[in-house]
Amino acid sequence: MQLIDPARSCLHCGAPFGAMVCTECAGARTDLDRCLAAAVFDGPVGRIVRAYKDGGERRLAAEIARIMLGAAVRAQREAPGRYGGLLVRADSVVFVPATASAFRRRGFDHMELIARHLSGSSDIPLLDALVKHGSSDQRELGRADRLAEALGAYEVVLPVRGKRILLIDDVITTGATMSAAASALKVAGASHVDGLAFARVWG
């Protein structure tokens, strides 16, 4: 597993190998204040994600949450100028919800389970604040199509006004999903939204 150096990653989408905003994010609008990914989406990480989401290995939720939480703790410690307060100033953990079709296929919301473990280990309250509209699978879509698909896809159903939100997802591919969810939270009044993911697709 290739962990991402928090001092050398894109602050907008978590992309590794550079202490500046990446090419994809330069000039692009996002409502994420900061974003961190724990690891590069490579062979071992991909196998973990597939085993958890589609292989029925729900026990992996606790381990994924542990790795994500460890990355956030490390980022606060090693890159305080970039990620200071990522955990300690967060008011609530909010997860990016699964689509209706994914929920039916798997029988559970994979991010809700991870969020419960992460919330329990960090003592940051869990807020099940987002609902996903639409049911299309984005795995085969490019950046532009993902952005178009994600616009208006999320509805905030619990109060978030004035809150600092730690928004979590399993894998960032283009950042469109995280950005759209963050946008919904900001429109609903969240004061600050940081993103945290298990992995970032790269290359």
State each model region's role:
Residues 1-203:
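Glycine-rich phosphate/pyrophosphate-handling loop used in enzymes and phosphotransfer proteins
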